[in-house]
A protein has these predicted regions:
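Short active-site neighborhood of thiol/selenol oxidoreductases, capturing the structured segment around
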Residues: 63-85, 91
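Structural microenvironment flanking redox-active thiols in thiol-disulfide oxidoreductases
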Residues: 88-148
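Short loop/turn microsegments at loop-to-beta-strand junctions
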Residues: 48-49, 71, 171-173
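N-terminal targeting signals for export/organelle localization
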Residues: 2-50
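Conserved small/polar residues in nucleotide/adenosyl-binding loops
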Residues: 205-211
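Thiol/disulfide oxidoreductase modules built on the thioredoxin-like
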Residues: 143-197
Length: 215
């Protein structure tokens, strides 16, 4: 009887997996789920949908290249003179923090692809000294980018989820995605404190999840 009790206690202890310090997000209203990683595999159904666009080097960039990586995404345009320079400066801080880590990536999507062709993105990358080894600037179909931003990345939260692609997309949000394509954070890309929190979250997520992903 005593042995059975000890076995039951052991099994109970093994079943109690720790709750993640970094929340999971499943809906565009960004309700946080502080659950264990094991529970998230069954509870969190939302994943970033597959995508493919051209980067600043004129190469086709496919989301499958992000498999097994933690990445940070934002939405900018090269002619933006208000929030985009600040957002790029803060993204540079993230790039610097993980410049030697091949399991962390940054992705910036242009929201004015009719202006921002690969040549424009290349000039932008040169201006801000962006390394294409871990930071990709992407352009492509406006409709594809806008749909991906609003319905996969929840870039404009609930208010923008069902907007038509004819409505201009402009957001300061930076979105953190884990190795399994799940959203783990949303930050104001113009605020240094938010950037610090994002860097901490990237570090935590990178170290605590296995590098198995379906993007």
């Amino acid at each position: 009887m005593k042995n059975c009790w000890l076995i039951s206690l052991f099994l109970l202890a093994c079943s109690e997996t720790p709750v993640s310090k970094i929340p999971y997000y499943n809906t565009p209203d960004f309700t946080p789920y502080f659950i264990s990683d094991a529970e998230a595999d069954f509870t969190i159904s939302h994943r970033i949908k597959p995508f493919s666009f051209f980067n600043q080097d004129s190469s086709l960039f496919e989301s499958k290249s992000l498999q097994g990586k933690v990445y940070v995404a934002n939405f900018i345009f090269t002619r933006c003179s208000n929030i985009c320079p600040d957002m790029t400066t803060q993204m540079k801080r993230i790039e610097k923090a993980f410049h030697s880590n091949s399991k962390v990536a940054l992705v910036s999507f242009t929201v004015t692809p009719w202006f921002d062709d690969v040549k424009s993105l290349h000039k932008f990358a040169d201006k801000y000294q962006i390394s294409s080894s871990n930071w990709s600037l992407l352009t492509g179909s406006k409709e594809s980018i806008y749909t991906l931003a609003r319905q996969s990345f929840f870039a404009e939260e609930s208010i923008g989820y069902n907007k038509d692609s004819k409505e201009f997309l402009h957001t300061e949000h930076v979105v953190l995605v884990d190795q399994k394509g799940r959203i783990r954070g949303i930050y104001n890309g113009t605020i240094p404190l938010d950037t610090e929190q994002c860097i901490e979250a990237v570090s935590y997520t990178h170290l605590t999840l296995p590098t198995i992903c379906s993007v």
